[in-house]
Amino acid sequence: MEPFTNDRLQLPRNMIENSMFEEEPDVVDLAKEPCLHPLEPDEVEYEPRGSRLLVRGLGEHEMEEDEEDYESSAKLLGMSFMNRSSGLRNSATGYRQSPDGACSVPSARTMVVCAFVIVVAVSVIMVIYLLPRCTFTKEGCHKKNQSIGLIQPFATNGKLFPWAQIRLPTAVVPLRYELSLHPNLTSMTFRGSVTISVQALQVTWNIILHSTGHNISRVTFMSAVSSQEKQAEILEYAYHGQIAIVAPEALLAGHNYTLKIEYSANISSSYYGFYGFSYTDESNEKKYFAATQFEPLAARSAFPCFDEPAFKATFIIKIIRDEQYTALSNMPKKSSVVLDDGLVQDEFSESVKMSTYLVAFIVGEMKNLSQDVNGTLVSIYAVPEKIGQVHYALETTVKLLEFFQNYFEIQYPLKKLDLVAIPDFEAGAMENWGLLTFREETLLYDSNTSSMADRKLVTKIIAHELAHQWFGNLVTMKWWNDLWLNEGFATFMEYFSLEKIFKELSSYEDFLDARFKTMKKDSLNSSHPISSSVQSSEQIEEMFDSLSYFKGSSLLLMLKTYLSEDVFQHAVVLYLHNHSYASIQSDDLWDSFNEVTNQTLDVKRMMKTWTLQKGFPLVTVQKKGKELFIQQERFFLNMKPEIQPSDTSYLWHIPLSYVTEGRNYSKYQSVSLLDKKSGVINLTEEVLWVKVNINMNGYYIVHYADDDWEALIHQLKINPYVLSDKDRANLINNIFELAGLGKVPLKRAFDLINYLGNENHTAPITEALFQTDLIYNLLEKLGYMDLASRLVTRVFKLLQNQIQQQTWTDEGTPSMRELRSALLEFACTHNLGNCSTTAMKLFDDWMASNGTQSLPTDVMTTVFKVGAKTDKGWSFLLGKYISIGSEAEKNKILEALASSEDVRKLYWLMKSSLNGDNFRTQKLSFIIRTVGRHFPGHLLAWDFVKENWNKLVQKFPLGSYTIQNIVAGSTYLFSTKTHLSEVQAFFENQSEATFRLRCVQEALEVIQLNIQWMEKNLKSLTWWL
């Protein structure tokens, strides 16, 4: 998507700019697609659909008591507050009758208000009269020469606001920010001053930028040729989070100017923007901390700025703090000065050119451990009592930094690299340039309580955020429609780097599992292309989903495999060198690949079939003699005819790889490109079987003819290790997904996993457990307990030998240790063998030692879950959660607490986390997902979400990853039409923006698919079991 450009002549000041009434190709018509932008975390305002004429200052929130009663009644009756008509609202006061024979006399206040309304109405009518005519339909205006496009908005002071687009104009661009902040961590307020050097690219009177929640006290303007500061008028349009600085003189193209804005604001109580919180240290003393989380749209809440990724600039940051605190920002500290009042002012060096969402600063009590790496000082920060848990992160960061510098052939450009573990942080981590922020659990590692999965998590997250220093920071997408360029590349490099320098962690197993789950999401009708047009805040937030991260990275894996690792690296290095410190779009990446391939392959044409279409292909293979007949169509889980894609609407350019019997993987991998609906591959000889999509490096599902499926099933029975563990897991995944679609009998899927008694690798076993667990959950939640029990018994018989071989230790390779965790959790969850007895003995001994006895870290979660089944065990775990300092151990305890079958305990857990009591609100989505995984918690989780929806969307932005997880985690196991209707009715009664959320549509579709799966497979499952 191209950034918004304004190449129109600027009208004289205080007049409406013509450009705001013309639609840009990438701008949504707000008469049809309004942006519902959250103004503050605790005050979300919505305007009625199609209305852009909100006039503030007219007492729009001042309802009479009768009107408030009507509002309450309307909500009780299920009426949508946003869709009520003004006629209904006025009728609430229509029942007030005057005494008989008397005429009511309007008060002076009423007459003044009426006169003001009349003036505003006349102004609006004049504006509309002077604009091009439009006949509005349900869909809005479509013809540019007949449409007003966007109706002129009003500023908060009632004046016309000179800009109506969500995107900022490009008539003025920032060059440098000088930001000074003085936070008060006791009152949770701050004072700020920002001086912005800008350049005018076109003649204009107005400078439009972002600002939300600021009490602006003074704005001055100065041109580069004059040293005289002049007062400037400021207008605010809070609906878009924008302010307009009306300059005292025209800004001339090519000239530089300086704005200075002085303001004050509250430190946010949510997790977005410049936010603060308190925590209790190991001495039970209350401590205060402030940090930032600006991505994607929250820098504007910390300081007025041009808050779009393409508006890159440099930053000089000063922070005034109390002496006991440490202040950090993106760049190294330049100086510290003690002020007259005893406060300290830290000034940081001027930054490199970067986007606003990457700006960061932290104030709190911290300690650090550091190491120099070729002139860059790498430091890991944590609160003082947890500094002993940063050693692994430092060692890992040093190795990864050296690897990325060598691979990208570009040195990390800053003199320091800080990684900070923040006690209360909602995101997993954030890649702020030079100041990476993390949850404690994703950065700290305690060898006594952190499992192999914990170690792998810390390593992956550090790798991901370091990769962002090049992909996202050095080279940045122009707009959020191409977020996948940031997140897809960082995710790909995360796994790629681990395979190179931490090969023992077998991170490919995690990447494979992530691809399986992402493809399940991408097979829904509610999916979206990874490069999608976005405008509103909700749409931007929704781009932060598994498709941007894992589909994006999966496509890069497929491309690397097809082109070769050397060609791929050469293209990536060229891309980074060509676009350093710039803003780019997808075509710039593909152009680099085309340059490296010398146009022998049109990479851009090939990859656009993957980035601009939602979904992925189903490749159907039939072997006849020495030929493979191939066809492609979209893999689509929903079988309803009315939403089936047409056969001609989807076509991908698919790199097809395959291996046959007796062929060595490294020498005999064959690759072809299918860029048509069907094709034929000639084999050198007749073979018994063929496995397409080697190691699942391609982003597609493969369906074989009946005989070919049977040949593969037979091969797994006689010798599964002819195929790689990735391919065995791939076959399990594909056949169960096809069975759900009805392409393969469910019996055949279970026939394929009959070989599992001979399987000893993690990926195939965990994928089989995942697929059968989905079926178990559907059966259990619908009350088919006998069938569910028989299913578990059958799976247990297949894996009985492997389960009995497991020891309750932390011995073995990382992959073996993770397999042990999965197998023992399966056995104890379903009370199979002597698993629960052994776990309970370990728990009792641990509890008797008051939690001081060491437990094997890889089975700790399973032990805690078994122990939490008793009231005494649950209460003991709760006490330990509150008192211990290891985040790794706390997470294991929390999962056990949330796995209880006691609904009172579960409700208390969710409520406590929502309120931030005992459990931080950052844990809430994890708690809801865990509660929703079990019976009867899945019903309770949904009830809790319904009851507290308004509070949830106040704490977390609408469309955010947290809201996505909460909606999915509380509904994904519903499989009845009653629940479908209930979920749909609930969200229909929320705001229109809420119902349109992709995660809501996905939740409804998943419930429909669960119903569809049961209707299609229940009978055959009953017969087979």
Swiss-Prot record:
Topological domain spans for side Extracellular: 132-1025
Q: Which reaction does it catalyse?
A: Release of an N-terminal amino acid, Cys-|-Xaa-, in which the half-cystine residue is involved in a disulfide loop, notably in oxytocin or vasopressin. Hydrolysis rates on a range of aminoacyl arylamides exceed that for the cystinyl derivative, however
Entry GO MF terms: aminopeptidase activity; metalloaminopeptidase activity; metallopeptidase activity; peptide binding; zinc ion binding
Instruction: Name any Gene Ontology BP term.
Output: regulation of blood pressure
Binding site residues for Zn(2+): 464, 468, 487
Cofactor: how bound: Binds 1 zinc ion per subunit.
Which compartment or compartments is the protein found in? Cell membrane
Q: Which PROSITE patterns match?
A: ZINC_PROTEASE
- Which residues does the annotation flag as glycosylated? 145, 184, 215, 256, 266, 368, 374, 448, 525, 578, 598, 664, 682, 760, 834, 850, 989
Instruction: Give the protein name, as stated in the record.
Output: Leucyl-cystinyl aminopeptidase
Quick one: which gene encodes this?
Answer: LNPEP
